[in-house]
Curated annotation (Swiss-Prot):
Belongs to the RNA polymerase beta chain family. It catalyses: RNA(n) + a ribonucleoside 5'-triphosphate = RNA(n+1) + diphosphate. DNA-dependent RNA polymerase catalyzes the transcription of DNA into RNA using the four ribonucleoside triphosphates as substrates. GO terms for biological process: DNA-templated transcription. InterPro entries: DNA-dir_RNA_pol_bsu_ext_1_sf, DNA-dir_RNA_pol_bsu_external_1, DNA-dir_RNA_pol_su2, DNA-dir_RNAP_su2_dom, DNA-dir_RNAP_su2_hyb_sf, RNA_pol_bsu_bac, RNA_pol_bsu_CS, RNA_pol_bsu_protrusion. Gene3D superfamilies: 2.40.50.100, 2.40.50.150, 3.90.1100.10, DNA-directed RNA polymerase, beta subunit, external 1 domain, DNA-directed RNA polymerase, subunit 2, domain 6, RNA polymerase alpha subunit dimerisation domain, RNA polymerase Rpb2, domain 2. Coiled coil: none annotated. CDD domains: RNA_pol_B_RPB2 (cd00653). This is DNA-directed RNA polymerase subunit beta.
Amino acid sequence: MTGRLVQYGRHRQRRSYARISEVLELPNLIEIQTSSYQWFLDEGLREMFKEISPIEDFSGNLSLEFIDYSLGEPKYSVEEAKERDVTYAAPLRVKVRLINKETGEVKEQDVFMGDFPLMTETGTFIINGAERVIVSQLVRSPSVYYSDKVDKNGKRGYSATVIPNRGAWLEYETDAKDVVYVRIDRTRKLPVTVLLRALGFSSDQEIIDLLGDNEYLRNTLEKDNTDSTEKALIEIYERLRPGEPPTLENAKSLLASRFFDPKRYDLASVGRYKINKKLHIKNRLFNQRLAETIADPETGEIIAEAGTMIDRRTLNRLLPYLEKGAGLQTYRPTEGVADGQISVQTVKIYAPNDPDNEKVINIIGNGFIAEDVKHITPADIIASISYFFNLLHGVGDTDDIDHLGNRRLRSVGELLQNQFRIGLSRMERVVRERMSIQDANTITPQQLINIRPVIAAIKEFFGSSQLSQFMDQTNPLAELTHKRRLSALGPGGLTRERAGFEVRDVHYSHYGRMCPIETPEGPNIGLINSLSTYAKVNKFGFIETPYRRVDPETGKVTDQIDYLTADEEDNYVVAQANVPLAEDGTFLEENVIARFRGENIVVKRDRVDYMDVSPKQVVSAATACIPFLENDDSNRALMGANMQRQAVPLLQPEAPIVGTGMEYVSAKDSGAAIICKHRGIVERVEAKEIWVRRLIEVDGKEVKGDLDKYRLLKFVRSNQGTCYNQRPIVKKGDIVEKGEILADGPSMDKGELALGRNVLVAFMTWDGYNYEDAIIMSERLVKEDVYTSIHIEEYEAESRDTKLGPEEITRDIPNVGEDALKNLDERGIVRIGAEVKDGDLLVGKVTPKGMTELTAEERLLHAIFGEKAREVRDTSLRVPHGGGGIVLDVKVFNREDGDELPPGVNQLVRVYIVQKRKISEGDKMAGRHGNKGVISRILPEEDMPFLPDGTPIDIMLNPLGVPSRMNIGQVFELHLGMAAKKLGLHIASPVFDGATEEDVWNILEEAGMARDAKTVLYDGRTGEPFDNRVSVGIMYMIKLAHMVDDKLHARSTGPYSLVTQQPLGGKAQFGGQRFGEMEVWALEAYGAAYTLQEILTVKSDDVVGRVKTYEAIVKGENIPEPGVPESFKVLIKELQSLGMDVTILTSDEQEINMENFDDDDDHAPDAIMVDVKPVESEEADEEKNAVTKE
């Protein structure tokens, strides 16, 4: 027997086929959310206040400083916030100090700065009662990027861009004549020497001394028609501010504020880090030949002679002296923008393609700029220009912008910080204005500060940002994946239309950082990704992945873990996780297959620097739940990973017999389960709560401590309308550890993720009913509620104040019989537990109608009988089509009881209806390998094929679905599942390290099955055996959220679009089926003239005709002639609006007046009791030829 037993949680053992021992535990999978938000609360907010503090007025007399801040206690708990439709938030208070410099008076105050949304323990936010997730965004990192391009004559040119976090872009480029240009903030290009002159290097000679003599610089100087700093500054000013009269002062201050003012230009710490890394001299000398002798600046001792080739060893010897300042040159330009001195570090080298040592190149580094200088400096600009000239001579590298070293993540904390910054800067403007207006002696900080812009900015971000998304809560895996999603879209990111193939493609630097498999199909493919299982995000926002270090001295693979970014990984040779190791950790084989910069290479074992931590570090959490992933084609694996997120939680979940070992971790970290916070003993277990008494160690003995109470959620509606239910899995008296699962959430079984059920599957056809991926199913699965799921829908009715008086929620509804009111209580609200069908009343509500003047008799009758029918109309809430079920809960909110309601609303009633949906024909099901299909037939058990022992099959799949799709993993799963079921085992077969073909054969033998795992099957109808033996086994099948009950829809008459008068489309609008252009052609082709006329007129937009037709059908008369379609009138009006004189003539050229056709229109909609809806403009722009019929 291969495989060993592994314990997952308290309740489940699996036989694991993993061969690779994992050194590193999986991290907490939602850490990307929680740690980022924690950083924001601890440091992000403080940074923001520090950035704008102090705010001074224009005279510099008053100064407002932000000293400290604190978050109070949230007003409502998470559950209350969901129930009351409010935001889960805590009040933010800031300590502010106002200093009056004239009088020396200091006022301190605590100012309330709005409620700040808090993150729940599971990494979500509750905004207006709805759970939302902030998705992390992948953006280009601020830095300097160099790229090459080949023009149409085959000449290679270069371009470079300095991209800040915010501020003006600086771009360099060459043209066909070898002149180097610069663009400042996307304006017209200037020769690059103009920018250098503006910095203070005024003469040609100074520029040549600075950058070194070369033909590109000479060409550029020839093209440059300025000859002094003054002219250069004015030239730049004219480009940036065309049409304004240039003065030297203005020009200087403009350039200085564009680039050297930290408020206007911000690289962020990551930009400074990347620029220092790219432009520092040490990274640019590697593998070059020195053209000068480098000496110790302090002692004059020679370290490297001219002509030395700088290899790794020489560079390491040079480093300390370069750090001390060898080759440091200081310039003190006077007239330029740059005040004070500019320090750059210069080393001369020979051009790489010049054996005669004639060409000497200056390499200029940006000196030593501290990490906290967030704006660009003159030294950076000079060094970036120098790098550009070096590139032209073949020194240096261009950048790959799709490399993950050049893309970084903006997680919740940073996105919030940016939003907060916007709010604070708006507030700062208001504070300045108020300082200058109000009396300086009597003013208080509270009066100065207007918190509205800050609150608005935060609200806008959570409410309407593209990155703030309604949480996908279909099942725990969907929740988890949503929190780990990486999106390249959103503000400051890409757009779907502009993104090319390169951005969407899998890149070698994604290894261990972003999943190559899990991404949506469709227009967003490759733009939305998922974080790999072991990946972490570092302080700069770059994704890191863990590797085991190989000790260079002994050649042993150690258990020391280093997290590397994509940039760092490029310097090392990394071996795969499945390389055979000896007991002591050395490589068994002399040659090892490894990766280096995206290439797979074979190297000697002593050249390996690192080794992968685990085979599943490549993929995301959802992909790691697919067993035998290694045997599936990647396209199908993508569908498998995506469809697991659409699995509906079942009534009786069951963990997969063949799993991967990820099920436990995914379920635990998703936030759907209840996790124990402290070690303790279970004192009480109920359906709604679990009590755990803490056990604390005192003097080596365990003593009972505080009591923790855990509330369980019962039958709550999730965001997607599935049922969110938690069940305890511990017993009274159990001793539980911290981090243990106390209660299963939806789609969980004994602490493991359980999205579907293990069913008996045969690969065979049956009367053609499983043609094209259709699925045939046994009735047993319906009878025994195997695939039954619970769905909860929420309906609400509100009574508002109208102009004619308040609406009223009541049982007294006009023209409604007593039998329709049988389920309503005395308030007019449906009772809990009632069974309701389509169209039944849920909440009785009446709205006042406009009063007509009553006669005296009517007034008398009215006074005597209190007849109400006259002045109100029925606007009750009824069950919509397909919404029938059992009333689960009713919540009533009243303004009188102090509930917070929107303005104008007096009472709000929410009714929850629960449906129990059994599986039926038309429902979509899938396996975990992208093998999806729709149920075409549910057969009685007695008709299903059966095994020799009489067991009927549960599901029949088409064998033709396997070969062309190349997802062989499902066949492995089938056989392994059958054997495990017979042996009573659960199995873990981790991705890329699971059971092999040999293992499957061995377990089949152990279970006493045939080696090919096929069985004779008997036809349930005749009892005869089928001709061939069939593959039968246990497969894990899930029911997806695409259910036929949600899609079935029919309409007789219903709402119409206002302009075209055609029926609306779609189930939500109770619309008709579109009879489009091509369908019209089909009828034309068959010459079906009357059908065609009927479809284009009375079934669509002939307003009068459809009313008359309706009346005729009701009265049983003959159907009248159709009239003129509304779209024809619209067309005429459109032509007339273009200024054309369009008239309609009869056959004998008599003019027809269209106005005559409109006589009957006014009462038309009322006649058939149909509401006419205004509709979005798209609806009106439809092709006139195509109509929507009912």
